[in-house]
A protein has these predicted regions:
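Short beta-strand/loop segments at the ligand-binding rim of alpha/beta enzyme cores
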Residues: 2, 78-87, 133-137, 148-156, ...
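Glycine-rich, proline-tolerant flexible connector loops at the mouths of alpha/beta enzymes
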Residues: 53-72, 111-117, 181-190
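Conserved anion-binding
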Residues: 10-11, 16-25, 100-186
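Conserved beta-strand positions in the central sheet of alpha/beta enzyme cores
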Residues: 55-56, 108-109, 137-139, 180, ...
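Conserved, mostly hydrophobic/aromatic
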Residues: 8, 46, 54, 99, ...
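Charged helix-capping and loop-helix junction motifs
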Residues: 67-74, 120-125, 161-166, 191-199, ...
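Catalytic cores of alpha/beta
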Residues: 73-87, 91-106, 196-234, 250
Length: 258
Protein backbone atom coordinates (compact mmCIF):
# COMPACT_ATOMS: atom_id res chain seq x y z
CA UNK A 1 0.00 0.00 0.00
CA UNK A 2 1.43 3.34 -1.05
CA UNK A 3 0.43 6.90 -0.36
CA UNK A 4 0.03 8.72 -3.67
CA UNK A 5 0.15 12.51 -3.33
CA UNK A 6 -2.01 14.78 -5.45
CA UNK A 7 -1.88 18.28 -6.89
CA UNK A 8 -5.22 19.62 -8.11
CA UNK A 9 -4.96 22.78 -10.22
CA UNK A 10 -8.00 24.97 -10.91
CA UNK A 11 -7.96 28.46 -12.44
CA UNK A 12 -4.17 28.54 -12.17
CA UNK A 13 -4.06 27.78 -8.44
CA UNK A 14 -3.47 24.67 -6.35
CA UNK A 15 -6.77 23.87 -4.63
CA UNK A 16 -8.80 21.24 -2.89
CA UNK A 17 -12.41 21.22 -4.03
CA UNK A 18 -15.62 19.29 -3.55
CA UNK A 19 -15.51 17.03 -6.61
CA UNK A 20 -19.24 17.00 -7.31
CA UNK A 21 -19.31 20.83 -7.37
CA UNK A 22 -17.15 21.32 -10.48
CA UNK A 23 -18.79 23.34 -13.25
CA UNK A 24 -17.19 24.37 -16.54
CA UNK A 25 -19.58 27.31 -16.87
CA UNK A 26 -17.86 30.17 -15.09
CA UNK A 27 -14.99 27.83 -14.10
CA UNK A 28 -16.70 27.37 -10.73
CA UNK A 29 -16.21 24.92 -7.87
CA UNK A 30 -16.86 24.72 -4.14
CA UNK A 31 -13.43 25.21 -2.59
CA UNK A 32 -12.07 23.60 0.58
CA UNK A 33 -8.58 25.09 0.28
CA UNK A 34 -6.69 27.53 -1.94
CA UNK A 35 -2.91 27.43 -1.63
CA UNK A 36 -0.67 30.46 -1.55
CA UNK A 37 2.08 28.25 -3.00
CA UNK A 38 2.38 27.13 -6.60
CA UNK A 39 2.35 23.57 -7.93
CA UNK A 40 6.14 23.36 -8.10
CA UNK A 41 6.31 23.93 -4.32
CA UNK A 42 4.30 20.76 -3.74
CA UNK A 43 6.23 18.85 -6.40
CA UNK A 44 9.49 19.63 -4.59
CA UNK A 45 7.91 18.57 -1.28
CA UNK A 46 6.95 15.20 -2.77
CA UNK A 47 10.34 14.75 -4.43
CA UNK A 48 12.13 15.36 -1.12
CA UNK A 49 10.09 12.52 0.41
CA UNK A 50 10.57 10.21 -2.61
CA UNK A 51 6.81 10.10 -3.17
CA UNK A 52 6.57 8.94 -6.77
CA UNK A 53 3.40 8.17 -8.68
CA UNK A 54 1.30 11.07 -7.46
CA UNK A 55 -1.31 12.56 -9.75
CA UNK A 56 -1.62 16.14 -10.89
CA UNK A 57 -4.98 17.05 -12.39
CA UNK A 58 -5.86 20.16 -14.41
CA UNK A 59 -9.49 20.80 -13.44
CA UNK A 60 -10.30 23.34 -16.15
CA UNK A 61 -11.79 22.78 -19.57
CA UNK A 62 -9.21 22.63 -22.33
CA UNK A 63 -9.22 25.65 -24.63
CA UNK A 64 -10.11 28.18 -21.94
CA UNK A 65 -7.87 30.90 -20.42
CA UNK A 66 -8.25 29.14 -17.07
CA UNK A 67 -6.87 25.93 -18.57
CA UNK A 68 -3.83 27.76 -19.91
CA UNK A 69 -3.12 29.23 -16.46
CA UNK A 70 -3.40 25.79 -14.89
CA UNK A 71 -1.29 24.24 -17.66
CA UNK A 72 1.53 26.65 -16.83
CA UNK A 73 1.39 25.55 -13.20
CA UNK A 74 1.51 21.93 -14.34
CA UNK A 75 4.65 22.44 -16.42
CA UNK A 76 6.39 24.10 -13.49
CA UNK A 77 5.66 21.11 -11.26
CA UNK A 78 6.91 18.63 -13.87
CA UNK A 79 10.15 20.57 -14.12
CA UNK A 80 10.52 20.46 -10.32
CA UNK A 81 9.91 16.70 -10.13
CA UNK A 82 10.59 15.01 -13.48
CA UNK A 83 9.26 11.44 -13.73
CA UNK A 84 7.64 11.80 -10.32
CA UNK A 85 4.11 12.83 -11.30
CA UNK A 86 1.27 11.61 -13.47
CA UNK A 87 -0.78 14.26 -15.30
CA UNK A 88 -4.44 14.38 -16.27
CA UNK A 89 -6.82 16.95 -17.69
CA UNK A 90 -7.39 17.58 -21.40
CA UNK A 91 -5.16 14.69 -22.50
CA UNK A 92 -5.58 13.30 -26.03
CA UNK A 93 -3.50 11.10 -28.31
CA UNK A 94 -2.31 14.27 -30.03
CA UNK A 95 -0.89 16.01 -26.95
CA UNK A 96 -0.13 13.10 -24.60
CA UNK A 97 3.52 12.86 -25.55
CA UNK A 98 4.00 16.58 -24.90
CA UNK A 99 3.36 15.87 -21.21
CA UNK A 100 5.67 12.85 -21.23
CA UNK A 101 8.38 14.95 -22.88
CA UNK A 102 7.82 17.66 -20.24
CA UNK A 103 8.57 15.16 -17.46
CA UNK A 104 5.35 13.31 -16.61
CA UNK A 105 5.81 9.63 -15.81
CA UNK A 106 2.28 8.86 -17.05
CA UNK A 107 -0.71 10.59 -18.57
CA UNK A 108 -4.14 10.11 -17.01
CA UNK A 109 -7.11 9.84 -19.35
CA UNK A 110 -10.89 9.73 -18.96
CA UNK A 111 -12.93 11.92 -21.30
CA UNK A 112 -10.90 11.17 -24.44
CA UNK A 113 -11.47 7.45 -24.03
CA UNK A 114 -15.03 7.56 -22.68
CA UNK A 115 -16.51 9.98 -25.19
CA UNK A 116 -20.23 10.63 -25.66
CA UNK A 117 -21.01 8.27 -22.82
CA UNK A 118 -19.38 5.16 -24.28
CA UNK A 119 -15.98 3.47 -24.41
CA UNK A 120 -14.27 4.71 -27.58
CA UNK A 121 -11.95 1.86 -28.55
CA UNK A 122 -10.41 3.83 -31.42
CA UNK A 123 -9.31 6.59 -29.05
CA UNK A 124 -8.13 4.08 -26.46
CA UNK A 125 -5.94 2.37 -29.02
CA UNK A 126 -4.66 5.70 -30.34
CA UNK A 127 -3.52 6.93 -26.95
CA UNK A 128 -2.09 3.54 -26.04
CA UNK A 129 -0.02 3.63 -29.21
CA UNK A 130 0.96 7.28 -28.65
CA UNK A 131 2.60 6.74 -25.24
CA UNK A 132 2.56 2.92 -24.74
CA UNK A 133 0.61 1.21 -21.94
CA UNK A 134 3.55 1.72 -19.57
CA UNK A 135 2.84 5.46 -19.50
CA UNK A 136 -0.97 5.37 -19.42
CA UNK A 137 -3.32 5.61 -16.43
CA UNK A 138 -7.05 5.18 -16.99
CA UNK A 139 -9.24 7.22 -14.66
CA UNK A 140 -12.47 5.37 -13.91
CA UNK A 141 -13.82 7.87 -11.43
CA UNK A 142 -17.40 7.07 -10.60
CA UNK A 143 -20.59 8.34 -9.03
CA UNK A 144 -23.62 6.51 -7.66
CA UNK A 145 -26.36 7.15 -10.21
CA UNK A 146 -29.62 5.48 -9.20
CA UNK A 147 -27.75 2.73 -7.38
CA UNK A 148 -25.20 2.10 -10.15
CA UNK A 149 -21.53 3.11 -9.81
CA UNK A 150 -21.28 4.98 -13.08
CA UNK A 151 -18.02 6.11 -14.72
CA UNK A 152 -17.99 9.92 -14.99
CA UNK A 153 -16.22 12.15 -17.53
CA UNK A 154 -15.61 15.83 -18.29
CA UNK A 155 -14.42 16.79 -14.83
CA UNK A 156 -17.04 14.48 -13.28
CA UNK A 157 -19.96 16.39 -14.83
CA UNK A 158 -21.16 13.85 -17.41
CA UNK A 159 -22.13 10.26 -16.80
CA UNK A 160 -21.36 7.40 -19.15
CA UNK A 161 -23.20 4.17 -19.85
CA UNK A 162 -20.40 2.23 -18.13
CA UNK A 163 -20.60 0.69 -14.69
CA UNK A 164 -17.46 0.39 -12.57
CA UNK A 165 -16.84 -3.32 -12.13
CA UNK A 166 -14.01 -5.82 -11.88
CA UNK A 167 -14.99 -6.98 -15.37
CA UNK A 168 -14.42 -3.47 -16.76
CA UNK A 169 -11.05 -3.26 -15.02
CA UNK A 170 -10.05 -6.63 -16.48
CA UNK A 171 -11.13 -5.56 -19.97
CA UNK A 172 -9.06 -2.37 -19.89
CA UNK A 173 -5.97 -3.75 -18.14
CA UNK A 174 -4.06 -4.58 -21.30
CA UNK A 175 -4.19 -0.94 -22.40
CA UNK A 176 -2.74 0.75 -19.31
CA UNK A 177 -0.25 0.59 -16.47
CA UNK A 178 -2.56 1.73 -13.65
CA UNK A 179 -6.09 2.77 -12.73
CA UNK A 180 -7.12 5.86 -10.78
CA UNK A 181 -10.54 5.85 -9.13
CA UNK A 182 -12.05 8.96 -7.58
CA UNK A 183 -15.24 8.27 -5.65
CA UNK A 184 -16.96 11.45 -6.80
CA UNK A 185 -19.72 11.33 -4.19
CA UNK A 186 -17.08 11.39 -1.43
CA UNK A 187 -14.39 13.54 -3.06
CA UNK A 188 -13.48 16.59 -0.99
CA UNK A 189 -15.99 15.89 1.78
CA UNK A 190 -13.71 14.15 4.34
CA UNK A 191 -16.61 12.00 5.53
CA UNK A 192 -15.03 8.61 4.97
CA UNK A 193 -14.24 6.50 1.90
CA UNK A 194 -16.95 5.02 -0.29
CA UNK A 195 -17.09 1.37 0.74
CA UNK A 196 -19.07 0.22 -2.30
CA UNK A 197 -16.23 1.41 -4.55
CA UNK A 198 -13.57 -0.24 -2.40
CA UNK A 199 -15.50 -3.52 -2.48
CA UNK A 200 -15.01 -3.61 -6.26
CA UNK A 201 -11.30 -2.79 -6.03
CA UNK A 202 -10.31 -5.01 -3.10
CA UNK A 203 -9.69 -8.24 -5.03
CA UNK A 204 -8.38 -6.71 -8.26
CA UNK A 205 -4.67 -7.39 -8.75
CA UNK A 206 -3.91 -7.23 -12.49
CA UNK A 207 -2.84 -3.57 -12.33
CA UNK A 208 -2.01 -1.02 -9.67
CA UNK A 209 -5.08 0.86 -8.45
CA UNK A 210 -5.24 4.16 -6.57
CA UNK A 211 -8.37 5.15 -4.66
CA UNK A 212 -9.27 8.76 -3.84
CA UNK A 213 -12.28 10.17 -2.05
CA UNK A 214 -13.37 10.92 1.49
CA UNK A 215 -10.44 9.50 3.49
CA UNK A 216 -10.53 11.47 6.74
CA UNK A 217 -8.93 9.42 9.54
CA UNK A 218 -6.00 7.13 10.18
CA UNK A 219 -8.54 4.37 10.79
CA UNK A 220 -9.85 4.92 7.25
CA UNK A 221 -6.34 4.21 5.97
CA UNK A 222 -6.01 1.08 8.09
CA UNK A 223 -9.40 -0.15 6.90
CA UNK A 224 -8.44 0.23 3.24
CA UNK A 225 -5.12 -1.51 3.87
CA UNK A 226 -6.85 -4.46 5.48
CA UNK A 227 -9.71 -4.62 2.98
CA UNK A 228 -7.38 -4.71 -0.02
CA UNK A 229 -4.54 -6.66 1.61
CA UNK A 230 -2.24 -3.76 0.79
CA UNK A 231 -3.10 -3.78 -2.92
CA UNK A 232 -5.06 -0.50 -3.01
CA UNK A 233 -2.95 2.67 -3.01
CA UNK A 234 -4.55 5.82 -1.63
CA UNK A 235 -4.71 9.55 -2.23
CA UNK A 236 -5.76 12.07 0.40
CA UNK A 237 -6.56 15.67 -0.42
CA UNK A 238 -8.64 17.95 1.79
CA UNK A 239 -7.96 16.01 5.01
CA UNK A 240 -4.17 16.32 4.62
CA UNK A 241 -2.29 18.93 6.66
CA UNK A 242 -0.52 20.40 3.63
CA UNK A 243 -3.95 21.28 2.24
CA UNK A 244 -5.41 22.69 5.43
CA UNK A 245 -6.57 19.38 6.90
CA UNK A 246 -5.80 17.49 10.10
CA UNK A 247 -3.91 14.38 8.92
CA UNK A 248 -0.13 14.66 9.16
CA UNK A 249 1.32 13.71 5.77
CA UNK A 250 4.47 12.12 7.17
CA UNK A 251 2.41 9.98 9.53
CA UNK A 252 0.19 8.95 6.62
CA UNK A 253 3.28 7.95 4.63
CA UNK A 254 4.58 5.81 7.51
CA UNK A 255 1.20 4.20 8.06
CA UNK A 256 0.92 3.21 4.40
CA UNK A 257 4.46 1.82 4.30
CA UNK A 258 3.96 -0.24 7.45
Amino acid sequence: MRFRPCIDIHNGKVKQIVGSSLRDEGALAEENFISESDASYYARMFRERSLAGGHMIILNKKGTPEYEASYGQCLGALKAYPQGLQVGGGITAENAHDFIDAGASHVIVTSYVFSNGYLNMDNLEKIRDAVSPEHLVLDLSCKNCDGVLTVMTDRWQKKTELELSEELLDKLSEYCDEFLIHAVDSEGKSKGPQKEVLDILKDFSSRKVTYAGGIATYDDIRMIGELGNGRIDITIGSALDIYGGHLDMDEVICLCRN
